[in-house]
């Protein structure tokens, strides 16, 4: 016998009046007595709070504001607590003898809302010796203690070995533990269950008949037939699911092509774009690499062009500089030629003028001599004319004087005066102041002698003059020549200078004779020098082009080396073309081979995909076509074996289904006809009577009744005898047993129970031995157990059958796949991998391209070397003949030397040309320069002075002679003597005068003629002199101009200048031609550089754009790949055969698929939106999202309970395998699961009958309950009329309403609701749906009406209402009802809890003083009979002789309020003893 769990004690910590109080609870009744305010309600409130710690339910009305419903109001709990931590704990012992302490920690929350914080907890494994108060309090001293917090309590319990502490965050977990450990009678899963439990406790606490419970007695008393309801729901759900599955299959069958089309088009749409992006990414990578290679190549080309540009710019600069210098040189040469030509013309002029000057010089000299002679003759004529004139004048004067003396008497005076005048003139002329007429004669002789002397001297001087004049003219001429040649010099230096000039002239003539040879030599040397300079320039250019400096001695060896290199390079170039041709031919062959393989690769890939699918499906690896055909044979054999096994499993499954169907019949009837016969006979199946038999008793009763376990129990066998006549629709053996179905027992047999068997004595001579069946099916529990095992077996069989069917279908499809593979791909599937060959060939192609590039580079380099070698040889060919010139290091010095000698010779030639004539003239007369002939000028002056002296002497002599002649005049006083004495004189004077006049005339005529002639001669001389001077001046000017020109005007100068100019012109033309070539090349190079720069910028831009595109695409591609791998669709999207299609073909493929997809998803808003978003070409990941969305959509559309994969493609493939099988199976399953209205009515009726029987059993326990005038209490259960009509229609008239139950659009619940509305149109169903109403109609509790009736005095049975009963009667009646509810809960929960646990039973009763002693005794008896604990409260002791009584007295001590408690056990024969712990229990409270 399982002991019932009990509450041991209630502990209050820090409650109002109770600091640390533990109430030991009696096993039956615990009474709390005391006056008002003693703490009875507080104690019960603490118990209820620990039992149901739900603040939404707790409501202690006796201390709460009346009518208050607000959640913020005090529900009566806040005022019962004291400040700080409070506890309420229940100490229990369950049926397993486990001590469990459950309780709550309470604490007031500060604020005006007066709220309380509650934390439930549980303690397991606590030793019996530990009191609850010891756990939550800490003793400080003898009079003080402290309450521990929950955390401290946890820490304290953690230190205790074997003690478990649990704190709960939800009330559901708290109540679940209490239910599992047997503390409460019902599992409180929800707030509704807690509310029912609280209403039960509340009704018990406050007593009376609770309207909240009586109105809903069905919920409290009638257990929810969850099994039946769940069976109905499962069956209906299975049917609904079956129908939905069938409909889904039909829809899937109809949409299968659409799904295939959707998957195919979505795969084409996304895979084409996926592979296009993959191809484009590879192409972009290749393009980026190509761009980078081309970029590097262009950079190298640009660098080479820049170097070339720099070289050409430098060379152009050199040529520009050289052109400037050449232009200057050419201009200088042209100017020099012009100057030479000008100088030549000047020289011709000079020579012409020099010839003219020489001729003029000769003529001038000749004319000068003529003029000199004419001048001498003129002087002589002048002297002769003057002398004649003087003689005429003297004679005229003499004659005049004489005539005057003769004519006039005064002639003496005149003569005397004339004598005096003559004396005076003589004195004056002779400078003789002492001259007298007497001394005149003496002086006359003297002066005549002097005159004679002067005349002789004059004649001598005239002779010298004549001689000196000739010498002087020669000297002057020689001196003038010397001065003209040498320049101004002293006359004394003329001889020395003339000799030097003559010696120098000889040297200069010698040098001048060397001008032409020197000039020819210089021209030759200059030509060689120019050739040497040209050779040096060529050598410098050659070294510059070769990039190395070479010695002259190395050039011949280098020439031979270059010729050898040219020969080898020409051979290499000629062989390179053949090698290049071979490489290109191999490259073309590789390209054609690659094209062929690329055309074959998609076919091979399709074959490989098919082969891989076959390998995945069969799990085998195939390496040859023979293995494929062998495996196909194995597949056929496996298919035959699987079909055989499937049929066997199907047969066994059908048998199990039939057995399950048989065991699932209502009431346990294995034959449907038994139910009809039981209704016909008005009896009950024996199996239905024993439907509640436990699983342990099922074998016994099954063996007890044996074959009659399917008998029908009827009240009277005699009444059905007539009905047995003609009975055909029945089992072969029909057992009928007479008995009361309501009180049937097994006393009809005499039974002896053996070990696992019974012996039934049917009659004196007939016994039946029956062993306990190993699988009993008698009783609902046994049937359910068997059905459960059968269901498990059926599940295994169904799974096995499904697996085998699937395997068969799979094998058949695999066979078809193998057949298709053999027909389509077997010929190519096992060939070599074309992609590997393509990769190998591509590698070889890359090697060939690299080799071609290297070959082109080498060939280009060889060509460049060949050209360089040819240029080098050409340059050397020009250089080698000039090696002697290059080796001649003294050539420039010799040119300078010859140039200097030529300059000297030309200078000498110019000197000779200029002064040769003067030197030639000077040479014969150089001797005259040895001495200056007395200085001819001085001689001329002496001659003039002597001439003057002779003239003066003549005049003096004449004057003296006149004085002497007139000496008589001084003594004569008259002239008569003179006239007479000189008459002859007059005549002589006249003759002489005539002669003198004639001489004078002749002299004058000669003088005039000579003067004219002299004038003419002088004019000719002057003109000659003027012409000479002019030409001399012009000559000097020309010579100065020639000197200013500064060139040598020789005969070869013009030719050399012209040759030099022509050479410079040729060099300038060549330089300009080269410069133009360089400019063109430079322009072309600059254009090439600009093109390369633009190309480089474009390449850099394209490369950066491509690289950025690659990087961006890589990020997007990584996101796409991540999305693809995360969603596992890479295998679907990475279709290698698409890699061989072009981007346009893939784009066309994707566009075609897009058009098809738009039509396919036109009715699906989500897929349509995702497809529209996926059309963005910049967001390829959205296409993956669309593909995933399509797959997700297909996963949602395809039943996952039918298909064993998440891959829609595989699901469709599997579904094609399963469709026909599932359709047939689900159709048969629907037929099996179909619910008949009659069976539903029977199930509901049987359930109602069973519950009615259970209520009758409960009523038997209440028959002896009496309170006051109430003699008995019972529950009356009736079926509602509307629902009874519904059951009748379901049983008898279901054919009239088959339109509802045969409709595929309505579930059975909905059809049941429609039928109920059709039968009861007057009832308003409100807003409830037919499904909800139908589910309510499937719950048998809604068919019943329950009410409590009491048998009160003379009134008999009447409905229990508070108004018709006294307070005590109502309390007793209500307590009886609550006991029934608790017992009902235990029966209902027995299947949910362990079989070894009997839960605690405890109720409350406050204000129990309203019951009389008889009613109290009845309560005590009821508690004893039902093993129930009861806590009652009353102002006074109502029954101290039974149970445990606590006397509570509230006291105030030193301003501290506490409750004094005294506990007494019930009276017994021995003296009553005080309960342990009650003497000192107030100490903590008082201490507080």
Curated annotation (Swiss-Prot):
Q: Where in the cell is it found?
A: Cytoplasm, Nucleoid
Coiled-coil positions: 326-418, 444-472, 509-602, 835-923, 977-1116, 1209-1265
Kindly name one Pfam family recorded for this protein.
Answer: MukB_hinge
Q: Which domain of life is it from?
A: Bacteria
Q: Does the keyword Ion transport apply?
A: no
Q: Which Gene3D superfamilies match?
A: 1.10.287.1490, 1.20.58.850, 3.40.1140.10, Immunoglobulin FC, subunit C, MukB, hinge domain
Q: Which residues bind ATP?
A: 34-41
Compositionally biased region (Basic and acidic residues): 1051-1065
Q: Which molecular function GO terms apply here? A: ATP binding; DNA binding
Keywords on this record?
Answer: ATP-binding, Cell cycle, Cell division, Chromosome partition, Coiled coil, Cytoplasm, DNA condensation, DNA-binding, Nucleotide-binding
Q: Specify where the region named Disordered lies, as residue ranges.
A: 1049-1074
Major localization listed first in the record, in broad terms: cytoplasm
Region (Flexible hinge) residue ranges read 666-783
- What Gene Ontology terms for biological process does this UniProt record contain? cell division; chromosome condensation; chromosome segregation; DNA replication
- NCBIfam families, per database record: PRK04863.1
Q: Which family does it belong to?
A: Belongs to the SMC family. MukB subfamily.
Q: What does this protein do?
A: Plays a central role in chromosome condensation, segregation and cell cycle progression. Functions as a homodimer, which is essential for chromosome partition. Involved in negative DNA supercoiling in vivo, and by this means organize and compact chromosomes. May achieve or facilitate chromosome segregation by condensation DNA from both sides of a centrally located replisome during cell division.
Describe its assembly. Homodimerization via its hinge domain. Binds to DNA via its C-terminal region. Interacts, and probably forms a ternary complex, with MukE and MukF via its C-terminal region. The complex formation is stimulated by calcium or magnesium. Interacts with tubulin-related protein FtsZ.
Query: What is the name attached to this protein's record?
Result: Chromosome partition protein MukB
The organism named in the record is Salmonella typhi
């Amino acid at each position: 016998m399982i002991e019932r769990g009990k509450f041991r004690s209630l502990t209050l910590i820090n409650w109002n009046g109770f600091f640390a109080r533990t109430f030991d609870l009696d096993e039956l009744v615990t009474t709390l007595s005391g006056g008002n305010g003693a703490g009875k309600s507080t104690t019960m409130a603490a118990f209820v709070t620990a039992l149901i710690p739900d603040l939404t339910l707790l409501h202690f009305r006796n201390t709460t504001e009346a009518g208050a419903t607000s959640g913020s109001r005090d529900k009566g709990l806040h005022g019962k607590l004291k400040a700080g931590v409070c506890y309420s704990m229940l100490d229990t012992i369950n049926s397993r003898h486990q001590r469990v302490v459950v309780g709550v920690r309470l604490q007031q929350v500060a604020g005006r809302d007066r709220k309380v914080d509650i934390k439930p907890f549980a303690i397991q494994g606590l030793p019996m010796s530990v009191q609850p108060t010891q756990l939550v309090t800490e003793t400080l001293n003898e009079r003080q203690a402290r309450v521990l917090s929950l955390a401290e309590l946890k820490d304290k319990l953690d230190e205790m070995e074997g003690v478990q502490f649990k704190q709960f965050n939800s009330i559901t977990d708290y109540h679940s533990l209490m239910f599992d450990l047997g503390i409460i009678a019902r599992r409180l899963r929800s707030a509704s269950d807690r509310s029912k439990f609280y209403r039960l406790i509340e009704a018990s606490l406050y007593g009376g008949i609770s309207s909240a419970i009586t109105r809903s007695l069905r919920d409290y008393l009638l257990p929810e037939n969850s099994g039946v309801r769940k069976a109905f729901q499962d069956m209906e759900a299975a049917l609904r699911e079956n129908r939905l599955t069938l409909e889904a299959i039909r829809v899937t069958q109809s949409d299968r092509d659409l799904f295939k089309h959707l998957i195919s088009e979505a795969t084409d749409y996304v895979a084409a774009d996926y592979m296009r992006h993959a191809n484009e990414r590879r192409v972009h990578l290749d393009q980026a690499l190509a761009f980078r290679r081309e970029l590097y190549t262009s950079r190298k080309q640009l660098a080479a062009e820049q170097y070339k540009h720099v070289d050409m710019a430098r060379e152009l600069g050199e040529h520009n500089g050289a052109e400037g210098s050449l232009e200057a040189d050419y201009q200088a040469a042209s100017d020099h030629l012009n100057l030479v030509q000008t100088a030549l013309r000047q020289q011709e002029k000079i020579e012409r003028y020099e010839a003219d000057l020489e001729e003029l010089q000769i003529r001038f000299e000749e004319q000068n001599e003529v003029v000199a002679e004419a001048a001498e003759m003129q002087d002589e004529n002048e002297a002769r004319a003057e002398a004649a004139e003087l003689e005429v004048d003297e004679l005229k004067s003499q004659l005049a004087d004489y005539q005057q003396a003769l004519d006039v008497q005064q002639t003496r005076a005149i003569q005397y005066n004339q004598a005096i005048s003559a004396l005076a003139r003589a004195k004056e002329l002779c400078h003789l102041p002492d001259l007298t007429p007497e001394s005149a004669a003496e002086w006359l002789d003297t002066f005549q002698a002097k005159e004679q002397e002067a005349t002789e001297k004059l004649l001598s001087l005239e002779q010298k003059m004549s001689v000196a004049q000739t010498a002087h003219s020669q000297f002057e001429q020689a001196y003038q020549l010397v001065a003209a040649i040498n320049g101004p010099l002293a006359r004394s230096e003329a001889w020395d200078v003339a000799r030097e000039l003559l010696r120098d002239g000889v040297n200069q003539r010698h040098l001048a004779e060397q001008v032409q040879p020197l000039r020819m030599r210089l021209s030759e040397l200059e030509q060689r020098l120019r050739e040497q300079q040209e050779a040096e320039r060529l050598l410098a250019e050659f070294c510059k082009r070769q990039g190395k400096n070479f010695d002259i001695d190395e050039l011949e060896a280098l020439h031979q080396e270059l010729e050898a290199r040219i020969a080898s390079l020409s051979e290499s170039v000629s062989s390179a073309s053949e090698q290049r041709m071979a490489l290109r031919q191999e490259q073309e062959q590789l390209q054609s081979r690659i094209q062929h393989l690329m055309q074959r690769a998609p076919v091979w890939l399709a074959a490989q995909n098919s082969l891989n699918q076959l390998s995945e499906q069969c799990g085998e690896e195939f390496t040859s076509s023979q293995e494929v055909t062998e495996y196909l044979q194995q597949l056929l054999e496996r298919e035959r074996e699987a079909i055989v096994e499937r049929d066997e499993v199907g047969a066994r499954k059908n048998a199990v289904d039939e057995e399950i169907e048989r065991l699932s019949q209502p009431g346990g009837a294995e034959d449907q006809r038994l139910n009809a016969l039981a209704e016909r006979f008005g009896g009950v199946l024996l199996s239905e009577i024993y439907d509640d038999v436990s699983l342990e008793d099922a074998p016994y009763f099954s063996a007890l009744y044996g074959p009659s376990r399917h008998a029908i129990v009827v009240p009277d066998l005699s009444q059905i005898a007539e009905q047995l006549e003609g009975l055909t629709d029945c089992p072969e053996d029909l057992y009928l047993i007479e008995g009361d179905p309501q009180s049937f027992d097994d006393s009809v047999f005499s039974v002896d129970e053996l070990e696992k068997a019974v012996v039934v004595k049917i009659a004196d001579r007939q016994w039946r031995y029956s062993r306990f069946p190993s699988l009993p099916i008698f009783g609902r529990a046994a049937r359910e157990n068997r059905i459960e095992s059968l269901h498990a077996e059926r599940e295994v069989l169904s799974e096995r059958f499904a697996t085998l069917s699937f395997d068969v279908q799979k094998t058949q499809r695999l066979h078809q796949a193998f057949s298709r593979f053999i027909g389509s791909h077997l010929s190519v599937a096992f060939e070599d991998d074309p992609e590997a060959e393509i990769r190998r060939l591509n590698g070889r192609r890359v090697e060939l391209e690299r080799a071609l590039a290297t070959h082109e580079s080498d060939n280009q380099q060889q060509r460049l070397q060949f050209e360089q070698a040819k240029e080098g040889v050409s340059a050397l060919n020009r250089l080698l003949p000039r090696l002697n010139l290059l080796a001649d290091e003294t050539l420039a010095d010799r040119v300078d030397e010859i140039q200097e000698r030529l300059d000297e010779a030309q200078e000498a030639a110019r000197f000779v040309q200029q002064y040769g004539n003067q030197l030639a003239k000077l040479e014969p007369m150089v001797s005259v320069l040895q001495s200056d002939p007395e200085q001819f000028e001085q001689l001329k002056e002496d001659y003039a002075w002597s001439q003057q002296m002779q003239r003066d002497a003549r005049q003096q002599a004449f004057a003296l002679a006149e004085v002497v002649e007139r000496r008589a005049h001084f003594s004569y006083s008259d002239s008569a003597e003179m006239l007479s004495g000189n008459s002859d004189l007059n005549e002589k004077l006249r003759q002489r005068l005539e002669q003198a006049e004639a001489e004078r005339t002749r002299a004058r005529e000669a003088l005039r003629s000579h003067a004219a002639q002299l004038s003419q001669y002088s004019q000719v001389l002057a003109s000659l002199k003027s012409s000479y001077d002019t030409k001399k001046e012009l000559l000097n000017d020309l010579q100065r101009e020639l000197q200013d020109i500064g060139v040598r005007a020789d005969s070869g100068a013009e030719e050399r200048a012209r040759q030099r100019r022509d050479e410079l012109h040729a060099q300038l033309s060549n330089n300009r031609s080269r410069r133009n070539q360089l400019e063109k090349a430079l322009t072309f190079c600059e254009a090439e550089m600009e093109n390369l720069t633009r190309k480089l910028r474009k390449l850099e831009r394209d490369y950066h754009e491509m690289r950025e595109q690659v990087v961006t695409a890589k990020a997007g591609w990584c996101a796409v790949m991540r999305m693809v791998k995360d969603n596992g669709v890479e295998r679907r999207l990475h279709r290698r055969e698409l890699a061989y299609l072009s981007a346009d073909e893939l784009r066309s493929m994707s566009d075609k698929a897009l058009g098809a997809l738009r039509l396919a998803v036109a009715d699906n808003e989500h897929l349509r939106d995702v497809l529209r978003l996926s059309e963005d070409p910049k967001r390829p990941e959205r296409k993956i999202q669309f593909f995933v969305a399509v797959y997700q959509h297909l996963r949602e559309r395809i039943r996952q309970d039918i298909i064993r994969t998440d891959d829609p493609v595989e699901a469709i493939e599997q579904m094609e395998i399963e469709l026909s099988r599932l359709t047939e199976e689900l159709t048969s399953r629907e037929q099996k699961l179909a619910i008949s209205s009659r069976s539903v009515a029977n199930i509901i009726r049987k359930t109602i009958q069973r519950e009615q029987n259970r209520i009758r059993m409960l009523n038997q326990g209440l028959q002896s309950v009496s309170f006051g005038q109430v003699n008995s209490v019972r529950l009356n259960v009736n079926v509602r009329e509307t629902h009874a009509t519904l059951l009748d229609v379901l049983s008898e008239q279901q054919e009239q309403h088959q339109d509802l139950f045969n409709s595929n659009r309505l579930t059975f619940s909905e059809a049941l609701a429609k039928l109920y509305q059709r039968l009861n149109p007057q009832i308003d169903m409100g807003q409830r749906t037919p499904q909800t109403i139908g589910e309510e109609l499937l719950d048998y509790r809604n068919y019943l009406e329950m009410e409590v009736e009491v048998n009160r005095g003379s009134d008999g049975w009447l409905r229990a209402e508070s108004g018709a009963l006294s307070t005590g009667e109502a309390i007793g009646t209500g307590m009886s009802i609550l006991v029934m509810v608790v017992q009902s809960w235990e029966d209902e929960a027995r299947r949910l809890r362990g079989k070894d646990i009997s839960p605690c039973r405890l109720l409350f009763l406050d204000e129990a003083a309203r019951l009389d002693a008889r009613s109290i005794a009845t309560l005590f008896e009821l508690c004893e009979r039902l093993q129930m604990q009861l806590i009652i409260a009353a102002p006074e002791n109502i029954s101290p002789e039974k149970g445990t009584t606590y006397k509570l007295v509230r006291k105030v001590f030193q301003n501290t309020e506490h409750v004094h408690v005294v506990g007494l056990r019930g009276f017994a024969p021995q003296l009553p003893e005080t309960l342990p712990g009650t003497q000192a229990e107030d100490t903590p409270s008082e201490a507080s």
